[in-house]
Structures are given as C-alpha cells and as structure tokens.
Amino acid sequence: LFCLLWVTVLTLSFAVPVLADLSHRKTNLEVVIKDHAGQPLPDAFLTLKMKRHAFRFGTQIRDHLVAISEEEFQVLSAREKQALMDPATEELGLAAHTPSWQDAERYREVLWNNFNHAIPTNGMQWIQYNNRGPEIVDKVVNLLKTKQFTVKGHSVVWPRDRWPTPDQFRSSVNQINPSIFYHQLLSDRLQDSGILGRFSDLGVGPAITDWDVLNEPMNNSYYADVFVDAGFYSSNTETFADFFKRAKGVRPDATLSINEYGILNAPNDNNARAYRDFTADLLAAGAPIDVIGVQAHMSRGNVDKASMLRRINILAETGLDIEITEFDTRDDA
C-alpha cells in the first residue's frame, strides 16, 4: 500500500507541471445542436469523434520501403532488401538487417496508425532523383495522399561536398567547372524545369506545397564557397538567400523551410543562438523563409526539457514558425 501511494504521489507531482505546460494546447469548445428549422435542441444527445488531428505528427520515411509492392520486393537480393532500411545501422557498427515482407507491412502499419505527415528521406535528393527518376517518389507521395497525409519535400538544396551532390560536382573531382555546377543546380533544383516545378499544380507530379529549401547550411557551406569564389555571389549569406528567392519565384504558393541539426540536443545554447543569427541574416538579405526547422535526433541524457524549451524560445526570436523536422530517438535513449 505504501509503495502504491508513493507511486501515485510521484505521478501526480510529475503530471501537474506537465499538464500546466500543455495548457496552451487546449481550449474550450461550445457545440450548439439545432433542428432543421434552426431552433436549438437543448436535450439532444451528441457523439463526437475526432477524424483528424490539426497538429502534424510527422516522421521521415524510407521511400522505397513504403512504395514497393510485394511482387517487386520478393525478387530483390538480400543486399537490395537491406538497402530499403535505414543505413545508419552500419554507421553505428550494427549488422545490416535483411527485412522480410512482413517487416515492410509492419513498417507501413506503424506509419498509418501513428502519423499524419511524412517526409520522404532520399528520393528527392539531387543525385538520387537524377539517377533514379521520379517513379518511386510519385508512387509514395500519391500513396501518402490517399492516406490523408500531408507531405514535405526534402530537400531542394543540401550543400554538402558529398552525397547527395552529384559526383562530378564534388571537390574530389580535379577540375570542377563552377559555371556548369551552378547552372545545373539551378536547372535541376531551383527553376520551373526542376523538382520544385514538377511537384506543383502546374507540374506532372503530385503537388507538394511544403519544402525544405536549404538543409544543414550552417554545417555545409560547400556550394556557397564554390559560387562565391567563382564570383557569382559576394557572400555565403547572399548565396543562400538567393536560393530561397529562386524557390519562391518557382513556387509562390509553397511554404519554404530552412533545416538544421545539433540545435536542441547540443551541450549548450550556443548552436541555437548561432542558428537564430544565421537565419536572421538570411531574412535581412531578403530570403523568403517561412519556417525554421529543427532536427531532433535524441540520445539518452543529452538534454533536459528546460534546455529544449529555452532553445526553442531563442529560435522564436526570428519571428518564424518553428518545426521539429526529424525527431527520432536511439534505442538506448
């Protein structure tokens, strides 16, 4: 009895501040039932059922794993099946898992039952999209839409000196032609002819109105470095701001985001302040940014609730909407 009472007291002491923190997410709802003549029915019995959350519960998905049919799956080699899964297992030194068709079905079941928003992980990335085309992306986006999901395009520009930048534009190539690099980027990613135009109401693909335009720019300045050195821009800020301007020119209807990692789960607030200032500089340069995105790859004990809230409030100083874009937890978290 003592143990039960102690647990109850502990639970209540924890619940009170948590519920208080969530008070801004609640409101009173008044429902008036009327008859066909518009007269109130005071004794009416009403049953309400939520059909859809207004809040977007989102997750990144393995595009091909969601889109593939059983017939297509069964003819894959073991290595090809492994490639459908998260490659991070190998990065963590774990043995690659070879999924069964039942695994694929369970993956989808968890997706349909727990989320209403999804971000295809790889299919829209520059090199992946160029090499494999839009077939898988079209299929998965259309499937998500039939399930009443909203979809975010990820990502228009990820300015890394490695994947997903096409091989011929990486610094490991002896002779990079900055002009070809620049104009190919614009054509493929930031013009009507590119990915933004294709996945629009005027394009041939399913329309996507929410895009990560610039992914991880604080940690990847490779494109800006090349283009500034070539004289196309005067600074990295001007470069990245122009990417947003071009994206908005192609898709004035779209919500455009910047996205960065190492903010909420950093050892201190310095990254949050740097991200705030980085984004503010882009806004001052005329970048039409709508959302500041924050990845949240969490592991055990690396941040507490107060620190996360403080960092979110730092980002709120930009005046932009804030979105947690890539939340996940390690198995040991």
Where are these regions (language model features)?
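Beta-strand-rich domain onsets/edges
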Residues: 17-66, 117, 126, 152, ...
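Active-site clefts of carbohydrate-active enzymes
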Residues: 162-164, 255-266, 294-300, 315-333
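Conserved, mostly hydrophobic/aromatic
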Residues: 31, 118, 211, 292
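Catalytic domains of carbohydrate-active enzymes, especially glycoside hydrolases
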Residues: 83, 94, 99-125, 143, ...
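Aromatic-lined carbohydrate-binding surfaces of glycoside hydrolases
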Residues: 63-64, 121-128, 149-170, 215-219
